[in-house]
Amino acid sequence: MPTNTTRLLPLIRAVLAATSALALVATAQAQEAEQETSSDGDSTTLETLVVNGGSGGVITAEGYVGISSATGAKTDTPFLETPQSISSVTEQQLKDRNPQTLLETLAYTPGTRVGAYGFDPRFDAFFVRGFDVTYTGVFRDNLRQPAAVDSIFKNEPYGLEGVSILRGPSSALYGATGAGGLYNLVTKRPTEDTLREVQVQYGSHDRYQGQFDFSGPVNEADPVYYRLTGLLRDADTEQVGVPDDRAYIAPAFTWKPDEGTKLTILGEYSRTKTGGTATYYNDPATGRATDIFAGNPAFNDSVQKQARIGYEFEHRLNDTFVFRQNARVSTLNIDADWDFAYGPNADDPTLLDSVAGTYDERLAAFVIDSQLEAKFDTGALEHTLLAGIDYTKLRFRALDGRGVSPPLDTKNPTQGRPVDPIDFNTRTVQDQWQLGTYLQDQIRYDAWTLTVGGRYDWVSTDTDTTDLATDSLTTISQKDKEFSGRVGLTYQTDFGLAPYISYSTAFLPNAGFNKETNQPFKPTESEQEEIGVKYLLPNSNTLITAALFNIDQKNGLYLEAVGSSNIQVQRGKLRSRGFEVEANTSLDNGLSLTASYAYTDVKIIQGPVGTVGNYVSSAPHHIASVWAYYTLPEDGPGAGLSIGGGARFVGSSYGNDQNTFRNSSRILFDASVGYDFAAIDKKYEGLQLQVNATNLFDRREAVCTAGYCHRDQGRTVIGSLRYNW
């Protein structure tokens, strides 16, 4: 790979140089800070932001630098004491980059592979450390966010305070999760200070959006606080017949009768309209993506409605014990029509034969997690003991139908083609419950912290599938149970360096059965060994982390060709080994920066015929990124101006598990510029203009995953006018 390595070297050098420079600059800043007793007009004061929520995912951050989170241990634990690789996307990063999707939100986090399916506004599909976490790795406020088939909850970035990322197997606290780790999305919560914001946006493809965010005390007498966040969007996309419309509203209330008691209610409703198909036609002769839209603008509506309401309750019983309970009910309904062109017509090669379908899916879930935390000493040992029990109940129902569609005319590929009504062919109903109980002790002695935890889960899954044409019913019932654990040791020096080592496991129950053996699938299991170091520079708001990891996953599910059809088989084993480094800083001089590099080697140890020993498709060895944002001094000629820019490198990878062809490497650039009108006159205080661009140079190359090829999302430019008062 000489060419790819050559292309990668400049960005790797940039990331490593940025990391080294951060240490030097931050150290110099710290030395200057020690010598200064007051700030001058050129400095920018950083505010420590606490995203409250108890075990729901509290994040404490200063600018771009996450300091502590409840994601790593379900207790508010400093990153330096967490014996596992952990990162955060802070509130300030969200403001500076103005992401429009969850994938854009996570684009600069280490080891996270976004864009494996190219342009596709239907789903937020992504990988970490080589493992898909779309269905199993997304949590909301430390509670599992279930997903099934096409029923995947959409996550609005404007409704988030931040994201905490815990990489590697994490079932010791969270139960059914995958090998890659979990992404905990922290919902905006009520603030005690008054917050008022309105914003209008206009961007590429006639994207119109208005949004608002209000928070503060309900009145001056009662300890009750509210927050109301919402947006309305009408937008086209780069594909004809694929809109990106959304209506979103999220109310929240907090009641704090005393310092030891808090109840927060979190709600949300959204309606999103996009396309049932968003892919490009793949030419069977070459196996590569063309520029022809594979769908049908006249039969391509996908409407998703989702709602959730839940609470977080915390009560301090005494100086030792704190009780917490988090719960949520969520529902999702998606109705979609789709059309897909798959190959040339036998009689007329200018036509492409197509198939069409329709589906109606409904997902309802209830999740509750009850915890008791105790802090006490035994001799010289300090303990933070956590005991908990959680329960998840979900029901998934799907109606699916397949039919015929008029062929696609390649001479006029965007012309709509009428499709006759399609009847549903099958109905699937799945009921699943999971019960887990866990225990964890964080034991501190001098500079040492030992974290030991274990969890036992029981899972029951019942699946009924009905052929509506014959009214025949197939029922599958299975029960799984599994123990998961984690042990980690951290040593924290008095100058901010914290090396650690850990071992953790995860399990994931699988629905269905092996058609070769007629036996239910076993749970997918994984284990990880990790060693790393974290460095919080003294007297400087800079955090640098690095980690080496080895993950083994067994009993994975794969599709294997048997005759003329594909069946699911379970005889797989994957191994992921790699290295990650990340640096985040927000300095007093107005500069904030995040940089990361990840090397990941993911191989198929056991799998379908022709794949053993190969690399997993669309899993690049190298991923690197750098993002910087600078606010010019208030007393200089550029007062009020902020500029930002970033680069995201994705190394080459294979386009299928057979490793017969490759995806090329690529670098995508992003940019931002903002202006605070208060620099002109104080009467304009609160009025700000910001313009953000992603994929600035409109690089739209093919990216292939599991043998099917897509295209990168093209350039988008969005201007925002925001007013706070």
Question: PLM features: residue spans?
Answer:
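Conserved C-terminal beta-signal and adjacent last beta-strands/turns
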Residues: 6, 384-385, 529, 617-725
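Acidic/polar loop-and-plug regions of large Gram-negative outer-membrane beta-barrel proteins
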Residues: 233-237, 249-316, 329-363, 402-434, ...
